[in-house]
Amino acid sequence: MLHTCLIDDNFKQSPADHCVYTKESKQTGKLIVVIWVDDLIIAANNTKSLEQVKTMLSTRFKMKDLGRLKHFLGMDFSQSDGCVKMSQGKYVGKILNRFDMQECRTRETPCD
């Protein structure tokens, strides 16, 4: 049902990951919808288009807008100045504790 709703609204399903849908045009800008079970992440480079997609979905489905993305699937997210930062610090901490490696030396890993 959600798949049909997105396809009817001109979203395209990613051939690489069937849980990712994209839509791009001069009118809407770039929109991305990621589905994980019953959770959605909706990203857009244009606030008006983001609100239109949320309105369209909320007329067809019961949904709750949780605002800006902060936590998803064990990852922490922060947004500022056109940048999205993702961290798995809590998960890494659990792994380090599990293998008694709390004192190991860290290294930064940039992501392009």
Which residues make up each language-model segment?
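Long, low-complexity, charge-biased intrinsically disordered regions
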Residues: 1-112
